[in-house]
């Protein structure tokens, strides 16, 4: 029944086979909305970013594999291979960028609107297998001596790489000789890492709850610890010193002997910083003198009678 889905199409009663297919009869295209610019030689395709780029409009990074609805246009030929240009809009801003195929170098070229993140390198530097160019292939086919030299060079490269490959094979066999123990060690290491990750997440959660923040904390690095230590020893900036001087002037009273209760505890600080004068202690000294004089003027009480005055009266 599945093969009938492509054949069982509805044909209206007024369908005329002389006008061609069903799409031509209805005045539509098989690609529907994707072919709205077909009269300009443009079709809409789903384009996948071949490498990492930066948008020139919003300066954001766009990773390899991000897909866009792109306008595909044929702009030329490289021998018998067509060259296509793709125009698409950035999903983060209103900027458009254009990318064109480069069949000669097996690559894509950015024409406008973006710049490429350079991650290209020479494959010969990391001993990758590089396909031969057309010139080398032609020379290998025509020149027997060059082919012999080429084979000798390949044999030498294989002999140089054989010890390294042998060490890799031996290490792989030693590690996975006992698959149960290797799996146990790997799982134990994973459990230890999971405990450390959960502990760090708990510390981060407590710190965020204490500071009432809703941000994602990155892992602590050595540079962060060094910067935190330098922040403790950092001197105050000119702006901070100016702010402290301005606050000190605002807290200073207008009169020399006045005390101000504003700015929190300024009156107490003023009292502590004021030097006591002699007149401030005069009241206490006066009270002490009055008490001493009154004590000396009072007559002591005696149990023996004083008859000196009566004797004088009688003698008189």
Curated annotation (Swiss-Prot):
Q: List keywords of the entry alphabetically.
A: Coiled coil
Disordered: region residues: 287-316
UniProt record, GO biological process: mRNA splicing, via spliceosome; RNA splicing
As recorded in UniProt, coiled-coil segments are 182-203
Say which family it is in.
Belongs to the CWC16 family.
Query: Per its UniProt record, what InterPro entries does this chain match?
Result: Saf4/Yju2
Cysteines engaged in disulfide bonds, as pairs: none
Cellular component GO terms, alphabetical: post-mRNA release spliceosomal complex; U2-type spliceosomal complex
Protein's name in the database: Coiled-coil domain-containing protein 130 homolog
């Amino acid at each position: 029944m599945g093969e009938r889905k492509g054949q069982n199409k509805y044909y209206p009663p007024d369908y005329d086979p002389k006008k061609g297919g069903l799409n031509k009869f209805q005045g539509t295209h098989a690609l529907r909305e994707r072919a709205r610019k077909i009269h300009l030689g443009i079709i809409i395709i789903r384009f996948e970013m071949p490498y990492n780029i930066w948008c020139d409009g919003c300066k954001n990074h766009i990773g390899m594999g991000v897909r866009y609805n792109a306008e595909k246009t044929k702009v030329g030929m490289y021998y018998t291979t067509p060259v296509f240009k793709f125009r698409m809009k950035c999903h983060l801003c209103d900027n458009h960028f254009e990318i064109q195929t480069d069949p000669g170098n097996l690559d894509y070229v950015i024409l406008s609107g973006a710049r490429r993140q350079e991650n290209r390198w020479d494959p010969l530097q990391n001993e990758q297998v590089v396909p031969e160019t057309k010139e080398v292939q032609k020379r290998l086919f025509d020149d027997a001596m060059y082919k012999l030299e080429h084979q000798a060079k390949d044999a030498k490269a294989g002999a140089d790489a054989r010890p390294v490959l042998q060490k890799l094979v031996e290490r792989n066999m030693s590690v996975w000789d006992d698959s149960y123990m290797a799996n146990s060690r790997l799982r134990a290491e994973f459990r230890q890492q999971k405990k450390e990750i959960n502990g760090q997440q708990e510390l981060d959660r407590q710190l965020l709850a204490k500071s009432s923040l809703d941000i994602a904390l990155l892992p602590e690095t050595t540079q962060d610890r060094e910067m935190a230590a330098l922040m403790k020893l950092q001197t105050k900036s000119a702006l901070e010193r100016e702010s402290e001087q301005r606050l000190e002037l605002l807290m200073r009273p207008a009169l020399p002997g006045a005390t101000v209760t504003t700015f929190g505890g300024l009156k107490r600080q003023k009292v502590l910083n004021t030097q006591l004068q002699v007149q401030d202690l005069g009241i206490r000294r006066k009270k002490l003198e009055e008490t001493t004089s009154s004590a000396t003027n009072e007559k002591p009480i005696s149990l023996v009678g004083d008859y000196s005055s009566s004797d004088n009266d009688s003698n008189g």
